[in-house]
Amino acid sequence: MTMGTGESIQQIREKLKGRPETAELERWRQDSRAGVRKLLETYDRKQKTQAEERERLERFQDLERAFWARGMDQVAGCDEAGRGPLAGPLVTAAVILPHSIWLPGLNDSKKVTAARREILYGEILEQAVSVTVSILGPREIDRLNIYQAAKTAMTLCLTHLKVRPQAAVTDAMPLEIPGMEVEDLVHGDSRSAAVAAASIIAKVTRDHLMEDLDRQYPQYGFAKHKGYGTARHIQAIMDCGPTPWHRRSYEPLKSMSLKEEGVSENQLLQLK
């Protein structure tokens, strides 16, 4: 041992995985062993990264904080996944986050890897005040058009949260909901933590549903393209015809003059 710490490198490594006392850190910094110095360098880098991420997440809630300052303590974010695909449901989510969050990597779902989205999904459900999810099937999308379907789904999500928000932020969707101040924000999922959280919940939920559909209809490749109009997907439609989950109002299906409607599979889930 060096400098009389009385601790092995392995013991120090284990303690650094938790929350070491300031006195312990100061003692270890006096240790001249190369292995201890390396452990502390790694620890310091991790602490710096976490501090920067906490600052980023705090800034990410600036929009919500403006509402809180006006006495609106419960602010929901709302976003959807699945406007553009030829097949599959439109999934919308609304999320109320607490005033203090620790959701490392939270961002617009399109900027987050699939693996990180899965982790964030669980962390959001654990930390959120309230979460709702709407699932609208192809028949409703065809009947309403995708814009009105998204508007309807967002309204349903925001009005069925178990904790009613005084304010809400949407990703570029203007809404009028009695008793709720709604701000529609372009690129809201990159500018509001609550909207970003909703985008993660919606995206992960929809991806799981498309993976389920892939098992039912393996020839279409739903697990890979998630219903978007890739060359393989369009070729599968031409070769095999549409499934009940294809949107009849989207090309090339619209030009096929199909008689049967798409499936009507609608759900409203209060996850928390």
Model-derived regions, located:
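RNase H-like, Mg2+-dependent phosphodiesterase core
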Residues: M1-A76, R83-K272
